[in-house]
Regions:
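Intrinsically disordered, low-complexity regulatory regions enriched in Ser/Pro/Gly/Thr
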Residues: 35-40, 53-58, 66-71, 94, ...
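Serine-dependent carboxylesterase/thioesterase catalytic core
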Residues: 48, 77-82, 90-221, 230, ...
Length: 367
């Protein structure tokens, strides 16, 4: 059956889902039912990857609103469209943070916030929440009587309660090193050369991904992002979310490797079998990892499993918070070589086999 589409004064409505383009070029998606839309208090920010656009999350956004019409208001970011994604993770993160604050200002009824990000967009979102984080504090309220208890202020992201932080095929450990970028075939010479020349193609973002950036003598940005650094509360922000989830392709993703997207060492990659779940046929492994206490655990020896010292610092730093790790396989799909796009359902007509991954994200979403 063909989709029913109509255009109102402020938006296009298709099968009960309303969407409109904002001044910044981003796309907002919400329920076409006014009563549902008015009660939605949970902002879901969807962030695309390198050289992408807001339309990359069109299917995912529409599914969120179709299934949770009275709960979520979805904003598909496009402040970092196309070639702007080459400006660096930090520059993109600042733009995204400003964009999110604008959305919050325009929607005063919002109370909660979540992020769903694909590929490099996951790093951009991690940077943005570091900027948007407001620490937990106790402060005197002008409305309280003298000598009364201090008012407690919870930590927040842009003034909203942080709920879900979800990344899909994101290179959390960067792109350098053994098999982190699969199309380099794990050949050390290829990987070394790529690190030297990647900035010619992917500019500043390439330097960040290959950990070759040197901003005035500072450590590489991805290393800075595994701790609170200056006025940027990277790890405090990440830890403030009730859930942190990584979805990773176990194979056939020739852009982002399994290890870097799942925040694991080589020795920690699990053995997996074909899924027996008819609802989620491409989800092959699920793992809930508790926060890792660095002070109470022995340091991991590097080198034997392809993990270098800097990568080990990233794994250890990010493991200081708990993670849900969801492993995905499209090895039987006719489009398995496009796994990096299929896992996101970047284009429904081409990548619809990944729809069960989107369904899994929504079914486990904390409202």
């Amino acid at each position: 059956m063909a989709a029913e589409t109509r255009v109102t004064e402020n938006c296009a409505v298709e099968n009960g889902v309303c969407s409109s383009e904002s001044v910044s070029g981003a796309e907002d998606v919400w329920s076409g039912n006014l009563s549902d839309a008015s009660s939605a208090d949970h902002l879901v920010v969807m962030v695309h990857g390198i050289l992408g656009s807001s339309s990359d999350w069109k299917f995912g956004a529409e599914q969120f609103v179709r299934i949770l019409p009275d709960k979520v208001f979805v904003h598909c970011s496009e402040r970092n469209m196309a070639k702007l994604t080459l400006d660096g993770v930090d520059v993109m993160g600042e733009r995204l943070a400003a964009e999110v604050l604008e959305v919050i200002k325009q929607k005063p009824g919002l109370r909660k916030i979540s992020f769903v990000a694909h590929s490099v967009g996951g790093l951009v979102a991690r940077y943005a929440i570091g900027r948007l984080f407001r620490p937990h504090r106790r402060e005197k309220s002008e409305d309280l009587l003298p000598n009364s208890c201090e008012e407690e202020s919870k930590s927040s992201i842009g003034g909203l309660e942080p709920m879900n932080f979800i990344t899909v095929a994101t290179p959390h450990l960067g792109s350098r090193g053994n098999k982190q970028v699969p199309f380099l075939f794990g050949v050390p010479v290829f990987e070394k050369v790529a690190g030297l020349f990647v900035h010619w193609i992917f500019k500043k973002t390439g330097r960040h991904l290959f950990l070759t950036d040197d901003d005035g003598g500072k450590p590489p940005l991805l290393k800075r992002m595994v701790e609170d650094y200056g006025e940027l509360y990277f790890m405090s922000a990440l830890g403030s979310f009730k859930r942190r989830v990584v979805y990773s392709n176990v194979g056939y993703d020739h852009i982002v490797g399994w290890r870097t997207s799942s925040i694991r060492r080589n020795s920690e990659l699990p053995k997996w079998d074909d899924s027996l779940n008819e609802k989620y046929p491409h989800i092959v492994y699920e793992e809930h990892c508790k926060a890792y206490d660095v002070e109470q655990n022995e340091p991991t020896v590097t080198g034997d499993d392809g993990t270098d010292e800097l990568e080990e610092e990233l794994v250890t730093g990010l493991s200081r918070v708990s993670w849900e790790k969801i492993d995905v396989s499209f090895h039987s799909s006719r489009l398995r070589f496009a796994a990096h796009s299929v896992i996101q359902v970047k284009d429904y007509y081409m990548h619809s086999e990944g729809a069960d991954v989107i369904q899994h994200i929504i079914d486990h979403f904390l409202i």
